[in-house]
Amino acid sequence: PQAFDEDLHVENVGGKVAMIELADNLKEERSQSLSASADVYRRFGAFQINFLIEGFYTKLSDVFALTDGEVVDGVLIRTRHNAPGARVMGLTLEGKMAYLSLLQLQAGVTLQQSRYDEPEKWSETAPAEKKIFRTPNTYGYFTATYTPIKPLSLSLSGTYTGSMLVQHMAGYIDKDVAVNTRDFFDMGVKVAYDFKLYKSVDLQLSAGVQNVFNAYQNDFDQGVERDSGYIYGPAAPRSYFAGIKISY
């Protein structure tokens, strides 16, 4: 076992600096995995279709977990230790479709379950949890590209993240609590047009919107006693962009 880069980052929890140290007897995580899949390709005239189904199962032994921590010289020290184990299992469905060079679609969804073998005690004031934190039971994505004429392309993409359990440490709030977050659908749209400047020089102009529906966390902590680790969902709210690219 070794310290990860993120372990060296300093967090702010309840007005205290929080850091992670490794337990003296920390053992490496071990996993045993099994998966099976079926993949089908078919052509129907000008349409090409691909469908994939995959099941997976992973058993984790000596899984890493964090204590709620203790304050030493004004610094909250959280210790990474080994929990008894955990299991992750689920099913992935993925499909692709193409119609000539005019339209391309791709989408996928994963249904999964992530559980500790025994409830994990993560706080002195909050109940132990058997569900692994920050692991939604459902997540998925899609992409679509439409090219009505060769220089012009219209793109649509999105990701879906289901509800998940997230730790919220005391400070800004009165006591530690495990929060069931809402689900998020983050969709983006982009328009691009290619111009031929010279024999081997192309110019592309593009513009679009990211996170069209403004699916964004709305309960951030504030002030000096905030929990800086209480962040989830899409990384940015609705935003607009434009770009220029020259290739040769």
Could you tell me what each predicted segment is?
Residues 2-10, 16-17, 63-71, 112, ...:
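Outer-membrane beta-barrel translocator domains and adjoining extracellular loop/strand segments
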Residues 19-25, 76-82, 122-131, 173-179, ...:
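Extracellular loop and loop/strand-boundary signature of outer-membrane beta-barrel proteins
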Residues 59, 151, 159-170, 193-248:
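C-terminal beta-signal and adjacent terminal beta-strands/loops
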Residues 50-59, 79-170, 213-216, 245:
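Gram-negative outer-membrane beta-barrel transporters
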Residues 4-29, 34, 48-50:
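Solvent-exposed loop/turn elements at secondary-structure boundaries
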